[in-house]
Amino acid sequence: MNRDAYFYLEMKEHELKVPYTGKNRRIRVLLPKGYAQDEHKYYPVVYMNDGQNVFYSGESFSGHSWKVIPAIKRNPDMPKMIIVGIDNDNEGRMNEYAPWKFSSLPILNFGLTLGGLGSEYADFFVNVVKPFIDSTYRTKPQREYTAMIGSSLGANISQYIGLEHKDVVGCLGVFSSANWLNKPEFDRYISKHKVSDQRVYIEVGTNEGDDTDKQLANGNLKQLYIDASLDYYRQLIDAGLSTSELKLNVVANGEHSEECWAKYLPECLRFISENW
């Protein structure tokens, strides 16, 4: 038993107005050990999408969380950091986590219009969330100390923000990216970008895909996920990153779930925080 893991981490909760919906969004902030005692210390910040799934399994969509609090407590040698969970928009999640409208999904045969608010969500993060966090807490606001982590569609929007706002975000954790949903659009977009001094951790399992995905794609879902991550790795190298700035983790039998992603969160945090 690791007695060093038994300590309290303070969490704060805030409501911030989302400009494109006019509604408030819950933002939760997990502060590092000793934050209140050392008033002269400043910290890197890790922003995590799908905030409902980040901290507690009881409120997670899947019934499993990312186990962020145990990950921090059980790895005390990692650099201290602030973790910010940004809730998704529930029924509007697919819209705000997709920079482009979906054009060729089976589900669209029912007359639905999905996607296309990713740019607005990115603006919300850059112009509302991050300035609020930087002004409220003792952060290191520079890009090299600012990370974003997401999974599935939450990974898609992380990939987009990492390119669109590369001057703001210097570290990414991309788990089980579903950018096969907008593959042609993403490929064109990333081909226009040059990237430098960014650390990116990429995780994908060999047993990806869930019941929701089956409504969104035809074909081999497992291969779609693997190809999306392998392509992204190569695209980042073409965009200017070195292999030392990238880590690709293909997990044998890894599934599309928080239970799987949580296992590799400490590895991700170690990699992106290497220079902190």
Please tell me what each predicted stretch does.
Residues M1-W276:
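Non-catalytic cap/lid and distal C-terminal segments of serine-dependent acyl enzymes
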